[in-house]
């Protein structure tokens, strides 16, 4: 009933808009512009390139790398260990948690937190902190009511978290003891750290039930948690994936076309950390990159399907939508800016950054998400879902505009161009005139900012040019191997070349990578991009429906790397993690389609 009313309302609004003067005026301009545009040499060239690409029969080659062999060996050993020690308490606990319903897990977590809060209440009451102990007592009572409500299946909560399995006395005792032990750490760790430990235990227990919850938490952490906590969630996710694979009844290792390149990059990162000019400074970037490559290898081994990836995409867009709303609020209230974020002569008063360090990093994040919105809009048939996606995308796009990040805008445009070009050229040719007309409707402040792209009158552009010149000098002195992984290595070596400033990085991803890991390392990063392009192209020809999601992830990477021509985009930990997460998603979708086609071919043969 609701969907019917919603559809009628949307149809009425669309009809009203189509009959309005504004729509007719701009549509007439669009038709005239479209006529000139389609007759241009640019369009003819696009069709020639598209025909060449479409006619190519590229099939990505797969071979097991050394990293694959090592990981396969470790995972098989883990599975054997699990099978041999299934009666051990720790493994039994993991298996039982996986078999529990969400209602039961929520109930036992409620008991654990109730006991922890009760112990905290007693300890603070003994210290004389009666106000805090009263608050903790109320919190303890609240968590106990959650436990009792779900255990007895009474109240409102069981309507949302159904529990069919019984809670045993042993399980109650185990979680109560866990709460007492966690509370016992309070005098040693302090309230903040002890509470973080308790919440960490709840998180680990919850995500052990379902790996996708760990991945969802990881996506959420990238936007809303500090770097250190995000890294903690990331490594918990890796542990949960390992446990999930180890608990499988059967296991078949998946090999993909990028395995060898990932292994080579991992080797380069390792060598350039050991031989870095600032070894301790390189460790941060090594942990982020090596951990992410391990995540990709493990992520590919999970039993995933395209529906799970749809949920991941929805959650990525939803979290970006929340960040986008926060950015819009910042723009409305006029959040204070740092002096280095904008040229004093530009007239810009506010640049939004949401939960990120600065507007450029926020733009890097947003432009990676936007192409996923295109993929959902094309895949979804329901008008309601399309409108919701469009609304969320509108908030994300508005926030991107308010970052006033020129590199971000260029990246977003490149991502849209690539997505539509690879998906369907006719859609791109319709989009370009609409985009050009849309430019005329943008505020003057945004148009002025766009016009300053490449202008040496702009202080930030002039500064970048100077840094690029010095970066090229460093590359000439360390051409093949670079100076060491990470921005700290760049900072240390650049002090010998740049005396008038102290830049954190080269303000260009390609120059920065060449400085850090040499031209050889940069070559293999580019090779990884080309390999991913080949995989996306192949899947689009084989299964366009699933390939569309894959294309959304790839266009997000391209958006980021185009932005990388004016900024070092692989500097912030969260962007590094998201970059490799996207590579992992492309790799996993490729693996899913490959497996489905093999099963289909086997059925036909039999």
Where do the PLM segments sit?
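Transmembrane alpha-helices and membrane-interface helical segments
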Residues: 203-209, 237-244, 294-301, 372-379, ...
């Amino acid at each position: 009933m609701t969907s019917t009313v919603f559809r009628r309302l949307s149809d009425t609004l669309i009809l009203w808009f189509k009959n309005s003067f504004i729509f007719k005026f701009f549509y007439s301009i669009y038709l005239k512009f479209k006529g000139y545009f389609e007759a241009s040499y640019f369009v003819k060239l696009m069709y020639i390139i598209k025909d060449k690409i479409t006619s190519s029969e590229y099939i990505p080659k797969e071979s097991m790398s050394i990293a694959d062999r090592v990981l396969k060996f470790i995972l098989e050993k883990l599975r054997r260990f699990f099978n041999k020690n299934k009666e051990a308490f720790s493994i039994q606990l993991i298996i039982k948690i996986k078999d529990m319903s969400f209602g039961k897990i929520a109930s036992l977590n409620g008991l654990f937190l109730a006991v922890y809060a009760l112990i905290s209440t007693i300890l603070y009451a003994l210290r004389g902190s009666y106000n805090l102990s009263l608050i903790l007592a109320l919190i303890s009572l609240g968590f106990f009511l959650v436990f009792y409500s779900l255990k007895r299946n009474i109240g409102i909560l069981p309507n949302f978290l159904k529990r069919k399995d019984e809670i045993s006395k042993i399980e109650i005792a185990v979680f109560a003891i866990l709460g007492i032990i966690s509370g016992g750490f309070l005098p040693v760790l302090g309230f903040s750290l002890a509470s973080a430990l308790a919440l960490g235990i709840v998180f680990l227990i919850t995500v052990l039930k379902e790996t996708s919850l760990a991945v969802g938490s990881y996506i959420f952490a990238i936007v809303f948690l500090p770097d250190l906590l995000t890294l903690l969630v990331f490594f918990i996710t890796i542990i949960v994936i390992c446990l999930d694979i180890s608990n499988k009844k059967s296991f078949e290792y998946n090999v993909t076309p990028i395995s060898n390149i990932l292994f080579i990059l991992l080797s380069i990162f390792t060598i350039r950390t050991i031989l870095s000019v600032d070894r301790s400074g390189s460790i941060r970037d090594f942990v982020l990159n090596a951990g992410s490559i391990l995540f990709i290898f493990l992520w590919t081994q999970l039993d995933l399907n395209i529906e799970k990836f749809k949920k991941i995409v929805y959650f990525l867009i939803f979290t970006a939508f929340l960040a986008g709303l926060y950015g819009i609020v910042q723009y409305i209230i006029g959040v204070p800016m740092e002096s280095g974020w904008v040229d004093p002569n530009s007239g810009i008063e506010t640049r939004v950054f949401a939960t990120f360090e600065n507007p450029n990093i926020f733009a890097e994040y947003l432009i990676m998400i936007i192409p996923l919105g295109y993929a959902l809009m094309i895949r979804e048939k329901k008008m309601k879902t399309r409108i919701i996606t469009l609304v969320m995308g509108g908030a994300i796009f508005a926030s991107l505009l308010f970052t006033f990040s020129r590199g971000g805008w260029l990246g977003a445009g490149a991502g849209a161009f690539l997505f539509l070009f690879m998906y369907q050229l006719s859609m791109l040719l319709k989009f370009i005139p609409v985009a050009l007309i849309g430019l005329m409707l943008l505020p003057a402040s945004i148009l002025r900012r766009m016009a300053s792209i490449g202008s040496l009158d702009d202080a930030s552009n002039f500064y970048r040019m100077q840094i690029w010149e010095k970066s090229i000098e460093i590359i000439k002195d360390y051409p093949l191997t670079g100076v060491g992984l990470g921005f700290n290595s760049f900072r240390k070596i650049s002090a010998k070349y740049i005396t008038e400033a102290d830049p954190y990085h080269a303000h260009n991803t390609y120059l920065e990578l060449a400085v850090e890991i040499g031209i050889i390392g940069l070559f293999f990063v580019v090779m990884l991009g080309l390999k991913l392009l080949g995989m996306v192209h192949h899947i689009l020809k084989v299964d366009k429906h699933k390939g569309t999601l894959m294309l959304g992830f790839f266009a997000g990477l391209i958006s980021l790397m185009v932005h990388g021509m004016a900024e070092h985009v692989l500097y912030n930990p969260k962007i590094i993690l998201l970059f490799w997460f996207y590579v992992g998603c492309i790799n996993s979708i490729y693996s899913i389609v490959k497996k489905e086609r093999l099963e289909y071919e086997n059925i036909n043969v039999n």
